[in-house]
Amino acid sequence: MTAPGFTVSAFILLLHVSFVANYPSGKVTKSCGGMIPEHGHTPQSHPAHNISVSQKTFRPGDQIKVTLSGPPFKGFLLEARDAENLSGPPVGSFTLIDSHVSQLLTCEDVQGSAVSHRSPSKKTEIKVFWDAPSGAPNHITFLATVVEKYKIYWVKIPGPVISQPNVPPFTTPEATIAPMPTVPSVSHLTRSFNASDCGNKKFCIRSPLNCDPEKERACVLLSFTRDDQSVMVEMSGPSKGYLSVAFSHDRWMGDDDAYVCILEDQIVHIQPSHLTGRSHPIMDFGDPLEDMAWRLVDGVMQCSFRRNITLPGVKNRFDLNASYYIFVADGAAVDGRIHKHSQQPLITYEKYNVTGDPKNIGGSHSLLLLKVHGALMFVAWMTTVSVGVLIARFFKPVWSKALFGDAAWFQVHRTLMLTTSALTFIAFLLPFIYRGGWNWHAGYHPYLGFIVMVLAVLQLLLAAFRPPLHDPRRQMFNWTHWSMGTAARIIAVAAMFLGMDLPGLNLPGPWKTYAMIGFVAWHVGTEIILEIHAYRLSRKVEILDDDRIQILQSFTAAEAEGYVFKKVVLAIYVCGNLTFLTMFLSAINRL
């Protein structure tokens, strides 16, 4: 397996397998040899595009204009080959005429030996120069693969043959037609899968745990039933576009044995594939899957197939007598093309042997480190920092008595803020441990988190050098401390809003957004109430100046009344705050 530099979320993100859609920049070097897009569809048999050349003879060093034209197409791959050995490597190199629509590729370690599209925009004509190399074969032909759209493409469209002067005439080599792979028959399921035998006769993975696909449309079921030397696999879930399962040696993407059921034009295609490191999954053909069947009813897609437990000599297929982590995913697909998933795949907590004793298990859509990261950030920036701010802002006169050498309010405030910083630091490290580095696929969330971490550290340093109460610099400290703290809280809330939608911790919605808005309103409302109360309380104080003697009206009763009110508001606020926090922590725990 590959190193954990790329999260398991890529399992479905990289199932977006399209010669054009997966490679919008035209970087299709991996297809140089066979010139075959990995679409999982049969190429068209009658070319609709044409290759023409500016001359029919050449000498080493000549430049020959090559034109590919025809109906609008999105992607292409153009190469020159030895006309007498079409399976050989590309010959010579190309020079671009319009670098805005085409680009050079390096095939077989020869720079510029192929040309491809630069973008998936539609085009009707491509012109390039082919540079004849020294030692070129006697006869050269040009081959092009053209992609009109995902499932409509032509492979190795032949162009004219050009020859060097004074060489034996070109004779077309005897055609060798490769046998077409046998297409297994696919039938329709007559009834829905059921989960009654899970844990008894079937090895089942379900999400939510113990759900029933016959009663719940959202239920995702994966079951394995051993039958002598083969295993029957069943998948059921919402008909968003595809269902997939993969067997993995660890919890990271790479070198995995995968199977995908893809909905296209109200037909379900069952396709084996394999994953290779960080590259796109490769659809496999001719694999010995048997008894394939599918069903599409009431928004639920179901598919099944049988495969032998051991497949000696078949590349990329795992021995199912061993134990593996199991990935289960579903998502959208358009025209047979799998799209980026919105949620992490369900991953079993440990390795299992699906052909062993029947079990009924679940899994998690989020790995433990990411769940702990989210939980710690919620505790820190929803609860500890919020309560700490209220204490410092409104409760100085309420808890002014000394506690361990300092005012009680200050001790509580300092403890809560140190806790916030400690939780933030721990939570900040966890994604780096999980991914082995910076996450470049999480949008603005990690950048906002980094800013929050920096501000939290600066706040600690600033607080450590707090000037004495009557020092002239104290007012500047107060404003700086307040400004940085307020900025950190606002940015932290924004980071939490964004983090809730990331695939690694995709909390179910839309309640999460409303709950976060509710928390913000709850906190802001509490601050407004305490501000109004403080203002009204100050109005009760009347200072009279008579012969330089200040007479303070009796304030003891009003002061006591104000303290009680503040304590009641704080108690209610903490209860509400903990309610919001519990909602989010419970949602994380259920992932």
Swiss-Prot record:
GO molecular function: metal ion binding; oxidoreductase activity, acting on metal ions
Lineage per the UniProt record: Eukaryota, Metazoa, Chordata, Craniata, Vertebrata
Cofactor(s) listed: heme b
EC number, UniProt record: 1.-.-.-
Protein source organism: Bos taurus
Signal peptide, first to last residue: none
SMART domains on file: B561, DoH
Protein name in the entry: Ferric-chelate reductase 1
Subcellular location per the Swiss-Prot or TrEMBL entry: Membrane
Stretches assigned to the DOMON domain: 216-331
Domain named Reelin: residues: 13-179
Function, as annotated: Ferric-chelate reductases reduce Fe(3+) to Fe(2+) before its transport from the endosome to the cytoplasm.
InterPro entries per the UniProt record, alphabetical: Cyt_b561/ferric_Rdtase_TM (IPR006593), DOMON_domain (IPR005018), Ferric-chelate_Red/DefProt (IPR051237), Reeler_dom (IPR002861), Reeler_sf (IPR042307)
